[in-house]
Amino acid sequence: MASFSTNEFKAGLKVMLDGNPCAILENEFVKPGKGQAFNRVKLRNLRSGKVLEQTFKSGDSLEAADVMDTEMNYLYNDGEFWHFMHPESFEQIQADKTAMSDSTKWLKENSNALCTITLFNGAPLSVTPPNFVELQITETDPGVRGDTSGGGGKPATLETGAVVRVPLFVQQGEVVRVDTRTGDYQTRVN
C-alpha cells in the first residue's frame, strides 16, 4: 500500500489514521526557531465525520486510504437502505442512514440523480448528491400582491420534505432548481 510523507500532505488527500480512513482538510508546515519542524494537520474521519487535529514530525508518513469515489444513479429507498446503481456496469450498492446524512432530503425516487459515493473496502462511507436538483413545491404560502416590504422570501416545502426559502412569486406546484451544497433556491424550471 502506498504511503505519503509529511511533505506530500495537501487538502483532499485521503489517508489512514489509527485504522480509520480520513481526509486532510488543512495542512500547515511549522518551522520553529528552535527544535524540529512539524506539520499541523486538520483531518476529517470519513466514517464518523468528526474533525480532529494532529501534529506530525517532519519526515513522518501515513498510509494511503483505499478510498474510491464513484458516480452512481439513485434508484429508490426501501425504508432502511438507499439503493444506487452504476450507470455502466449496472452494479448495485445500498447505503444506510449514516452514509446518507443530509443527502436524503435532495433525492427523489426514479430521478436517476447522479450521486458521488465514497467507498471504503466496498462499503459506502458517504453519499454526495448532485450539485443541483429540480424538485416540485408541495406546500407554500400564496404570494400576496404588494407584500414585498420584507424583501426576503417565503418558506416552501419540496416533494422530498426539504424546506427552502423561495421568492414571493413562486407558487405551489412549480418546479424549482435548488443548490444542494447550500440549500438555496436558484431558479424556476419551466
UniProtKB/Swiss-Prot annotation:
Pathway: Protein biosynthesis; polypeptide chain elongation. Gene3D superfamilies: 2.30.30.30, Nucleic acid-binding proteins. GO terms for cellular component: cytoplasm. It is found in: Cytoplasm. Pfam families: EFP (PF01132), EFP_N (PF08207), Elong-fact-P_C (PF09285). May be beta-lysylated on the epsilon-amino group of Lys-34 by the combined action of EpmA and EpmB, and then hydroxylated on the C5 position of the same residue by EpmC (if this protein is present). Lysylation is critical for the stimulatory effect of EF-P on peptide-bond formation. The lysylation moiety may extend toward the peptidyltransferase center and stabilize the terminal 3-CCA end of the tRNA. Hydroxylation of the C5 position on Lys-34 may allow additional potential stabilizing hydrogen-bond interactions with the P-tRNA. InterPro entries: Elong-fact-P_C, NA-bd_OB-fold, Rib_uL2_dom2, Transl_elong_fac_P/YeiP, Transl_elong_KOW-like, Transl_elong_P/YeiP_cen, Transl_elong_P/YeiP_CS, Transl_elongation_fac_P. It comes from the Bacteria. It comes from Psychrobacter arcticus (strain DSM 17307 / VKM B-2377 / 273-4). HAMAP family: EF_P. Keywords: Cytoplasm, Elongation factor, Hydroxylation, Protein biosynthesis. One of its GO terms (biological process) is peptide biosynthetic process. The gene is efp. Belongs to the elongation factor P family. Involved in peptide bond synthesis. Alleviates ribosome stalling that occurs when 3 or more consecutive Pro residues or the sequence PPG is present in a protein, possibly by augmenting the peptidyl transferase activity of the ribosome. Modification of Lys-34 is required for alleviation. This is Elongation factor P.
